[in-house]
Amino acid sequence: MDLSCSCATGGSCTCASSCKCKEYKCTSCKKNCCSCCPMGCAKCAQGCT
């Protein structure tokens, strides 16, 4: 669990595998927001493009 995000890391999300986080809330999103958080984590997904 990332202290700045309400979701657990290690899950997967619905956006394309090539997306990156512009403004990430989770430190693990610095790598790839699509692989750091599970579905439903709006705090991570909002930074995806």
From Swiss-Prot:
One Gene Ontology molecular-function label: metal ion binding
Binding site for a divalent metal cation 2: 7, 13, 15, 26
Sites where the protein binds a divalent metal cation 4: 33-34, 44, 48
GO BP terms, alphabetized: cellular response to cadmium ion; cellular response to copper ion; cellular response to zinc ion; detoxification of copper ion; intracellular zinc ion homeostasis
The name this protein goes by in its record: Putative metallothionein MT1DP
Database matches in PANTHER family: METALLOTHIONEIN (PTHR23299), METALLOTHIONEIN-1E-RELATED (PTHR23299:SF48)
InterPro entries: Metalthion_dom_sf, Metalthion_dom_sf_vert, Metalthion_vert
Keywords annotated in UniProt: Metal-binding, Metal-thiolate cluster
UniProt keyword annotation of Metal-binding present: yes
Binding site for a divalent metal cation 3: 15, 19, 29
UniProt binding sites for a divalent metal cation 6: 37, 41, 44
Family matches, as Pfam families: Metallothio
Residues the record lists as binding a divalent metal cation 5: 34, 36-37
Name of the coding gene: MT1DP
Protein family: Belongs to the metallothionein superfamily. Type 1 family.
Amino-acid positions noted as binding a divalent metal cation 1 in the UniProt annotation, renumbered to this chain: 5, 7, 21
Function: Metallothioneins have a high content of cysteine residues that bind various heavy metals.
Location of region: Alpha: 30-49
Region annotation (Beta) ranges: 1-29
Highest taxon, organism lineage: Eukaryota
GO CC annotations on file: cytoplasm; nucleus
